[in-house]
């Protein structure tokens, strides 16, 4: 049975081509033809998945959170969905569950989210609606200090058809992502500065900016990093569209994901594996689960760890090739076909769950 589904994006997420973050890209990838996607207004072309309708946010001097919630309710009353899917906003999901069946998809640690900070709040959410996390790590964080809960895992996915064909590998080490301290980008620059003189035939590239989109601001962190990167011989490209990043991953011999932040999934690592690069990730959050045995682990701040892993790979072409093949096989487990089949199943579960839960 085809369900009418309204998908609600987080307030800061843009559903526009060239400006979309990870959540919007995933929503577009998985969207069914009849899905309606809603969120903040955009001025550029919307992403192709589903049908995007901007929220009409009230001009009244009310808290932004309240105005966003009321706009979502108005959109739900207009569309009359069988199910509302809310991404990363537990408080909004609980509010909307009073009016329609809701499925909450968590992309980050819920312990820092409004409406899910305490075990009691998370318990209440799990009793009222179907909660899904993008990784085992997220589900464990949601269940922490709670009684028995029913929480599903809905892993992120990739469109394998969008992955560029295998190309000759350049002797390049690539970092791709947000250029912020949490992502360990300064550790990458430090590591490269330490070892570059031993590898004159190799180059290092840093793709990304503080946030997604071409109008990303210059930040104090970036201002400090630029001269360090220049001195280390790391080429900084600034923000690049998603397709360009995939092209770079398909050419780079090595991709590093040196996050300090406990990555709730690790999309960059998954995409790098799909592109056939040899990958190095931090042993934090969901990253070890996502890569399995198809990547090397190295802590960004452990003395010599990242440098050692890079040298290990740059010294051994056979190991790079082996990890590249393992990575492609691992990434195939996260393909779109499997993800869409699971999505339809979870949607039906969410509607059935809502019918069986008591609404006060």
Language model feature labels by segment:
Residues 86-91, 106:
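Short His-centered aromatic/hydrophobic patch
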Residues 293-304, 312-317:
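Conserved acidic donor-binding segment of nucleotide-sugar-dependent glycosyltransferases
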Residues 250-264, 277:
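Acidic donor-binding loop of glycosyltransferase active sites
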Residues 137, 157:
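Carbohydrate-associated surface elements
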Residues 218-243:
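Nucleotide-activated donor-binding/catalytic signature segment of Leloir-type glycosyltransferases, i.e.
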Residues 6, 132, 165-183, 187-196, ...:
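Conserved donor-binding/catalytic core segment of Leloir-type glycosyltransferases
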Residues 239, 247-252:
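Short alpha-helical donor nucleotide-sugar binding micro-motif in glycosyltransferases
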Residues 9-17, 25-64, 92, 212:
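N-terminal strand-loop element at the rim of the active site
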């Amino acid at each position: 049975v085809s369900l009418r589904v309204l998908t609600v994006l987080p307030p800061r997420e843009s559903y526009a081509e060239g400006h979309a973050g990870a959540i919007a890209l995933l929503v577009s990838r998985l969207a069914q033809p009849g899905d309606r996607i809603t969120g903040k207004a955009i001025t550029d072309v919307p992403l192709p998945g589903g049908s995007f309708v901007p929220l009409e946010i009230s001009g009244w001097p009310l808290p932004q959170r309240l105005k966003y919630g009321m706009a979502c309710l108005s959109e739900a009353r207009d569309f009359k969905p069988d199910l509302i899917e809310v991404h990363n906003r537990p408080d909004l999901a609980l509010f909307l569950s009073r009016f329609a069946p809701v499925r909450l998809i968590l992309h980050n640690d819920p312990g820092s989210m409004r409406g899910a900070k305490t075990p009691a709040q998370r318990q209440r959410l799990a009793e009222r609606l179907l909660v899904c996390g993008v990784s085992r790590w997220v589900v464990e964080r949601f269940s922490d200090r709670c009684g028995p809960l029913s929480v599903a895992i809905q892993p992120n996915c990739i469109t394998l058809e969008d992955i560029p064909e295998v190309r000759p590998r350049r002797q390049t080490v690539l970092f791709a992502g947000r250029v912020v301290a949490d992502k360990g980008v300064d550790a990458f620059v430090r590591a490269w500065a330490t070892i570059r003189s031993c590898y004159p035939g190799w180059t290092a590239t840093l793709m990304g900016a503080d946030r997604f989109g071409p109008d990303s601001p210059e930040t104090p962190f970036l201002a400090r990093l630029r001269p360090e990167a220049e001195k280390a011989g790391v080429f900084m490209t600034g923000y690049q569209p998603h397709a360009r990043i995939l092209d770079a991953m398909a050419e780079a011999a090595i991709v590093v994901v040196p996050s300090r932040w406990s990555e709730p999934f690790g999309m960059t690592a998954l995409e790098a594996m799909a592109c056939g690069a040899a990958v190095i990730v931090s042993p934090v959050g969901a990253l070890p689960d996502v890569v399995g045995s198809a990547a090397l682990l190295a802590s960004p701040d452990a003395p010599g760890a990242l440098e050692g892993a890079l040298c290990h790979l740059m010294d051994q072409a056979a190991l790079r090739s082996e990890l590249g093949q393992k990575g492609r096989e691992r990434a195939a487990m996260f393909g779109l076909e499997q993800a869409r089949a699971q999505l339809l199943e979870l949607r039906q579960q969410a509607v059935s769950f809502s019918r069986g839960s008591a609404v006060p």
